[in-house]
């Protein structure tokens, strides 16, 4: 019996070992298959992403001569039958095609077409958000209230498909601006053909942005409160917080700074004039308070953004040389009693007051709608602003407001060859058909994932 029991135990042990071995082998095979699947998926995604990425153009190696086009210089001047030559990324000649000057490099016959400086989108958040519904792709709004040290530039995604889709409409540069909080952070200006944010930057940390509080408030109707406008009892307190913050920052900068304060250090450019303060404000009282209190503190380089009611305080803005970045023209009136077309006439009203005007992009679906920048200017042109003045609002005026007018914003000798050729009027949807575009002299691709899909499905339904 004992011998039989021992044999039974041996058989049972062998079965257990065999079963464990089989289970272990299955487990190893399963893990191996998982690894193969994961590696294959990562490889697929990496290759797919590589193929999908826009490839920045190579540095200019030969000159270009654009001849015969109507040149819109961005200064208000137009040259019919023009000649424009650029080399090494810089414009070296702008004039009539009848000029007796040797053409250089590749000649582009642009007879019947139009050439423009690259359009500039001010107060935009391109490259900071890719998909609104995916929080991981949203870098436009940082946690906190007073954030002058938050730099939008380092979060800018140069490979964004949204940024890429701006170029076929002639939008080649933009001011990348953070959102949210009282002091949102620091913006920078970039060009839209780059490998990374370092290559994209054409002016780093150009301005700090502040959202000025409103003096009026509404009750929360969903909680049974009166929805009518009334004075905000906390307005004075909110304004004082801003004044105190900048006053403290100024005192810190004038001290020996034994203990580092990064947010205060970030405001240095506001006090020495190397940076601008973009004040996002609406209402005569708000604008007046913002300008007056910032001037008292010692911040003099100011830009007004939005500026509802700015026409009523035009003398204050002119006296202090403050330009206004107005909102897009394609929007409904803000006030219940506003004229139905006030949004379209806003530029004309302010321009007649002598105020320098640029167009900003903040608003609903602002990143996708930035491609419509030339058409916003076109609508302002249709409502009283001349075509060339409307063009200035998105070229030389925006360049001046952003502090980059010494090298971009107009077609002038010595400036960057950032420009494009359009078959028709670039401020009209039917005419804005680009044939060529250049950024700092580099001939860039006008293909995007959208144009590829357009061509694909156009061919599908094309009749023979």
Please report, for each region that a protein language model flagged, where it lies by residue.
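Bacterial Sec-dependent N-terminal signal peptides
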Residues: 1, 5, 9-13, 18-59
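His/Asp/Glu-enriched, well-ordered alpha-helical/loop segment
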Residues: 68, 131-132, 137-143, 149, ...
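Divalent metal-coordination and catalytic microenvironments
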Residues: 69, 84, 89, 112, ...
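Histidine-rich, glycine-flanked metal-binding segment
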Residues: 71, 75-116
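Polyanionic/metal-chelating signatures
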Residues: 162, 169-301
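Glycine-enriched alpha-helix->loop->beta-strand junction motifs that scaffold or abut catalytic
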Residues: 294-301, 318-325, 354-356
């Amino acid at each position: 019996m004992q011998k039989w029991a021992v044999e039974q135990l041996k058989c049972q042990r062998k079965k257990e070992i065999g079963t464990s071995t089989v289970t272990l082998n299955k487990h190893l095979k399963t893990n191996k298959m998982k690894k193969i699947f994961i590696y294959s998926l990562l490889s697929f995604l990496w290759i797919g992403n590589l193929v999908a990425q826009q490839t920045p153009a190579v540095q200019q190696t030969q000159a270009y001569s654009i001849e015969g086009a109507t040149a819109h210089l961005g200064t208000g001047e137009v040259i019919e039958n023009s000649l424009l030559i650029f080399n090494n990324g810089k414009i070296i000649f702008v004039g009539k095609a009848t000029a007796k000057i040797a053409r250089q490099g590749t000649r582009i016959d642009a007879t019947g077409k139009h050439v423009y400086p690259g359009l500039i989108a001010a107060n935009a958040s391109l490259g900071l958000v890719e998909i609104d519904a995916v929080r991981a792709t949203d870098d436009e709004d940082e946690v906190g209230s007073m954030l002058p040290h938050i730099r939008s530039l380092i979060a800018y995604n140069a490979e964004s498909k949204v940024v890429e889709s701006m170029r076929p409409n002639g939008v080649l540069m933009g001011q990348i601006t953070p959102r949210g909080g009282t002091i949102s952070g620091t913006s920078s200006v970039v060009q839209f053909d780059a490998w990374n944010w370092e290559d994209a930057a054409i002016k780093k940390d150009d301005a700090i942005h502040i959202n000025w509080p409103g003096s009026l408030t509404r009750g929360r109707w969903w909680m049974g409160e009166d929805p009518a406008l009334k004075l905000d009892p906390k307005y004075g307190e909110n304004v004082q917080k801003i004044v105190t913050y900048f006053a403290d920052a100024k005192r810190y900068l004038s001290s020996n700074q034994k203990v580092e304060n990064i947010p205060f250090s970030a405001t240095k450019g506001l006090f020495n004039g190397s940076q601008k303060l973009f004040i996002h404000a609406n209402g005569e009282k708000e604008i007046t308070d913002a300008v007056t209190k910032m001037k008292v503190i010692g911040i003099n380089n100011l830009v007004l953004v939005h500026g509802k009611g700015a026409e009523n305080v035009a003398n204050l803005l002119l006296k202090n040389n403050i330009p206004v970045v107005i909102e897009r023209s394609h929007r409904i009136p803000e006030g219940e009693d506003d004229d139905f077309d006030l949004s379209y006439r806003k530029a004309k009203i302010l321009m007649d007051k002598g105020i320098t005007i640029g167009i900003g992009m903040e608003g609903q679906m602002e990143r996708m709608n930035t491609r419509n920048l030339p058409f916003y200017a076109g609508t302002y042109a249709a409502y009283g602003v001349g075509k060339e003045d409307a063009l200035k609002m998105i070229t030389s005026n925006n360049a001046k407001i952003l502090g980059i007018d010494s090298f971009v914003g107009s077609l002038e000798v010595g400036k960057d060859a950032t420009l494009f050729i359009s078959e028709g009027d670039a401020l009209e949807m039917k005419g804005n058909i680009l044939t060529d575009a250049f950024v700092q002299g580099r001939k860039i691709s006008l293909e995007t994932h959208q144009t590829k899909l357009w061509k694909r499905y156009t061919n599908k339904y094309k009749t023979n």
